[in-house]
């Protein structure tokens, strides 16, 4: 019936209303693109507690988003079978029982609750001067070759390169025509983070960020800075030099992605989330029932063909 979220740790006195959250939910609302689910949800948030007379009280903030267009009947043909790429099998193995009407806690619909809570954290961090830029770095085999922050808002795929966005759209059309889906890479840049946040061992900043991003269901890998590319570099190529000017120490490059030794170094924090293709595709796939019978399954219903848009927003908010 609804998606909920509870946010702990927000200090008292932050100006907050439902519209502050709603603007973020509008950006990930279903049905805004040919490549996302056709499900129509208003995604209207209600603040149930933790705010009084437009200010946070310091107590937990409870949020509610009501579902208005759920169709449980769409899942009737998978009630007793395991969908490839989904968590149906592992849910059954862990709990011995599952609700087959969607993915439950592994559903993309869970994004709404995370985004609503993250919107509050974004507002708090913005008051400290910390800002975020998130975009699709690649969709399928199509990668960006240029960067325009304005262009991110000009296309449905949130790519900062208009030419790449056009090519990615053509690629997604091919996926649609073949009843398939696409993965991609989301990049997030966090600016104005002071040096020294994090810890040296158990609470490393990069480990904390990776833990948060990997909690998003579609994410299969996280990179920080140059990521896996550092394996191809020499030490002299990978090391970020330091320079002092007017009493301020900064780096000459940012291969480390703003984090060294588990702590922020004052430069931009750069991370990438690798998103798997949406597993709900209409092609016939081999699977089994919960009683062990082999069968060919065709998944019906309203599903994303690409999750980069809403996962990108979720990545930004999980970095809060």
Annotate each language-model stretch with its function:
Residues 1-313, 320:
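Generic N-terminal targeting/processing segments that precede catalytic cores or assembly contacts
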């Amino acid at each position: 019936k609804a998606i909920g979220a509870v946010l702990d740790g927000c200090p008292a006195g932050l100006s907050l209303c439902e519209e502050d959250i709603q603007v973020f939910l509008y950006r990930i609302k279903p049905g805004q693109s040919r490549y996302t689910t056709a499900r129509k949800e208003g995604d209207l948030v209600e603040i149930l507690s933790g705010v009084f007379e437009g200010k946070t009280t310091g107590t937990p903030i409870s949020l509610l988003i009501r579902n208005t267009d759920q169709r449980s009947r769409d899942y009737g043909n998978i009630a007793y079978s395991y969908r490839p790429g989904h968590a149906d099998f592992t849910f059954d193995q862990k709990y011995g029982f599952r609700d087959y009407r969607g993915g439950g806690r592994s559903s993309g619909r869970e994004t709404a609750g995370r985004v609503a809570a993250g919107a509050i954290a974004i507002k708090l961090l913005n008051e400290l001067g910390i800002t975020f830029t998130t975009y699709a770095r690649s969709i399928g085999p199509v990668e960006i070759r240029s960067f325009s922050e304005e262009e991110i808002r000009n296309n449905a795929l949130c790519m900062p390169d208009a030419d790449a966005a056009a090519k990615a759209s053509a690629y997604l059309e091919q996926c649609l025509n073949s009843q398939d889906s696409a993965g991609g890479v989301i990049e997030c840049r966090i600016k104005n983070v002071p040096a020294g946040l994090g810890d040296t061992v158990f609470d490393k900043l990069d480990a904390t960020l990776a833990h948060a991003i990997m909690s998003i269901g579609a994410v299969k890998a996280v990179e920080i800075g140059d990521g896996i590319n550092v394996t191809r570099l020499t030490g002299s190529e990978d090391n970020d030099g330091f320079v002092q000017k007017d009493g301020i120490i900064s780096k000459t490059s940012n291969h480390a992605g703003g984090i060294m030794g588990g702590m922020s170094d004052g430069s931009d924090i750069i991370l990438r989330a690798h998103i798997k293709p949406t597993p709900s595709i209409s092609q016939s796939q081999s699977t089994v029932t919960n009683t062990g019978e082999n069968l060919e399954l065709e998944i019906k219903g309203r599903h994303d063909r690409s999750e980069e848009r809403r996962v990108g927003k979720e990545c930004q908010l999980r970095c809060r």
